[in-house]
Every structure is written in C-alpha cells, then in structure tokens.
Amino acid sequence: MNGFKAVRVPVSALSGEPLPDVFGTKGDCLVAFEVKAPKAERAYSPREQVEKLFLFLNFFEPFSQKKAVLGAKFPRKWVFRMVEKPDDFVVSREEQSSYHLETQ
C-alpha cells in the first residue's frame, strides 16, 4: 500500500461493530476501506455501512487526516471512491477511481 501499514479485518458476517474491511496508516493519515466484489456492474454500499467507516475513523483522534474509501473489485478492474459523509452509494464499473494511494 505505498508505504502504508495496513490490516485486513476478517469479519465475514455483518457486524454491529464499526469495523472496516481494511484500514491503513501512514504518518498522520488513517484510511478505512469498505470493499465489495459485485457480480454485476455496480457495487451498492448502504448508508449504515458507510456510517460505520466514519465511526471507526472517529475512534482515532491522533490522526489529522482521516479518509473513508469505498472499494469495488470488478473483473479486471478496481474502483476506489473517497466519500465525505455517510450516505447510500453506488460504485459503477464504468467510473474512474477518485482515490489513489500514490497521492498520499
């Protein structure tokens, strides 16, 4: 992850805990990822799941940069979208990533 220290959180079932699928740190930056692997052309992330990313990020006060990112793994393509607030989101296979680790 481009100099990031990262951890995959192995939670296979829906959990009441605000745990992301993956999180990574680099310096004063913390990034939390919710990842989907849809069979269709779109990945849906309901508001409740996105809200958990922000709850997780808020646990860590020392980090001045906190980012919530939705990831979708389509056949032969990944799309990453940074989100600013909890809401319902759809990530399409056709869109370009709005988040890139290289810019960190």
Language-model features, listed with the residues they occupy:
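Conserved catalytic cores of phosphodiester-cleaving nucleases, focusing on short active-site segments
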Residues: V22-G24, D28-K39
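Beta-rich catalytic cores
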Residues: P18
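Flexible, glycine-rich phosphate/dinucleotide-binding loops
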Residues: S15, V31, E41, K77-W78
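Residue-level detector of flexible, active-site-proximal loop/helix-junction positions
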Residues: A13, K39, D87
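Short, charged, amphipathic alpha-helix that recurs within catalytic cores of restriction-modification
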Residues: P38-L70
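Acidic-basic catalytic patches of nuclease active cores, encompassing PD-(D/E)XK
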Residues: M1-A13, T25, P62
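Structural signal for conserved beta-strand scaffold positions within catalytic alpha/beta enzyme cores
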Residues: R8, E34, L70-A72
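Domain-level recognition of nuclease-like catalytic cores that cleave nucleotide substrates
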Residues: P62-Q104
